[in-house]
UniProtKB/Swiss-Prot annotation:
Organism: Pseudomonas aeruginosa (strain ATCC 15692 / DSM 22644 / CIP 104116 / JCM 14847 / LMG 12228 / 1C / PRS 101 / PAO1)
Sequence segments annotated as region (Disordered): 74-141
Protein name: Sec-independent protein translocase protein TatB
Regions of compositional bias (Pro residues) in chain numbering: 89-115, 130-141
An example Gene Ontology biological process: protein transport by the Tat complex
InterPro entries tied to this protein: TatA/B/E (IPR003369), TatB (IPR018448)
Residues annotated as transmembrane: 1-21
SS bond list: none
Length: 141
């Protein structure tokens, strides 16, 4: 944790034994342990609070950016008729629902619809048949 080896720890223990004596050393070790535990807990609490704030700030920043983007899109839609440009197509955000699959529409037919009255007679025969000439009958002079 701090890079303290066992020999350094042993040296600190011997100095504490010489300075405090055998009577006060257990109480001092207990007090030092409590202080170290409190410091660890407070550092962990501060660390969690900072991480929570960073996460909240990031979410707040993301929402702010999305709000700005939506306002820009609305402004472009409103200004598009004035500038003569087509408004940009809206693309859904990545987290949004996927668009419904498009159903292809059949191409329009190029032949005009036939009215029901003409449908009974074939149009090619009716239009191309010339009137029949009168049959020849003998003439009386």
């Amino acid at each position: 944790m701090f890079g303290i080896s066992f020999s350094e720890l042993l040296l600190v223990g011997l100095v504490a034994l010489l300075v405090l004596g055998p009577e006060r050393l257990p109480g001092a070790a207990r007090t030092a342990g409590l202080w170290i535990g409190r410091l660890k807990r407070s550092f962990n609490t501060i660390k969690q609070e900072v991480e929570r704030e960073i996460g909240a700030d990031e979410i707040r920043r993301q929402l702010h950016n999305e709000h700005i983007l939506s306002m820009e899109r609305e402004a472009q839609k409103l200004l598009a008729p004035l500038t003569g440009q087509n408004p940009p197509q809206e693309t859904p955000p990545p987290a949004a629902e996927s668009p419904a699959p498009s159903v292809p529409t059949p191409p329009p037919t190029s032949t005009p619809a036939v009215p029901p009255a003409d449908a009974a007679a074939p149009p090619a025969v009716a239009a191309s048949t010339p009137p029949s000439p009168p049959s020849e009958t003998p003439r009386n002079p």
